[in-house]
Amino acid sequence: MAEDTSTEKRYLPIGSVVQLTGGEKRVMIYGRRQRQVDSEVLWDYIGCLYPEGNLSEEYMYLFDNEQIETVYFLGFQDQEEFAFQQRLIDAG
């Protein structure tokens, strides 16, 4: 099998469940390419605790691909998701 050597950034689909490096709980992704309001920093993802879900702003986590240690579940993917993935990639 050929190794994927592309430098194109890929995003996990909504609903993916991941473990962040140094994290104690798993996180479920519910948004991508999120801008932090108070600093204008652009993050790859926003997530909430799994299995608890979105409890409050206090429990929202902004993070990048590089911070993901393990992917436990890959979210739903269909043609609409693949088209949106391409829009995210094209946006840089």
Can you say where each PLM-predicted feature lies in the sequence?
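Short, glycine/acidic-enriched capping/hinge loops at junctions between secondary-structure elements
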Residues: 29-31, 40, 59
